[in-house]
Amino acid sequence: MLYYLMLKRRKSAMQRYSDCPQILRDFLAYHESIKGQSPLTISEYHLDLRMFLRFMKLMRSDMPVNTPLEAIDIRDVDLNFIRGIETSDIFDFLSYLATDRVYEPSSPAPDHGISAKSRARKLSAIKSFYKYLTVRTKLLEENPVADLEYPKIRRSLP
């Protein structure tokens, strides 16, 4: 009975990520089961990496450039697609986050660009994903984010 409950819980947890490719679901399962990270951390990794892969797919396709990221299906992203991502592509994504990403879409006058702290968190998720693919699973030989620096975060006054 306990095994059944655990299997049911695992299945429902992975169904939450049914909008993602298998390789991303495997990464999230690794962080959940092996690394023991919190559900909130796993959820943030899911959102950050889903946005990253959607952006990459938009940049590499014939879709109109103004296609909303939320409308892009990434379930067909495979290892070859991920292998083709270069450091310059990641710079493009970080630039998009810094200048074009709407900070608060529901506000009457939305600001563009997210904070350095938010960009650093997204870069951390990408770095973790590529470390998993190169070091843990050895599915990739090269890590395009290995030497990327994090955005400078301003310290606030106390």
Where are the language model's segments positioned?
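N-terminal core-binding DNA-recognition domain of tyrosine recombinases/integrases
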Residues: L7-K11, R25-L40, R50-L157
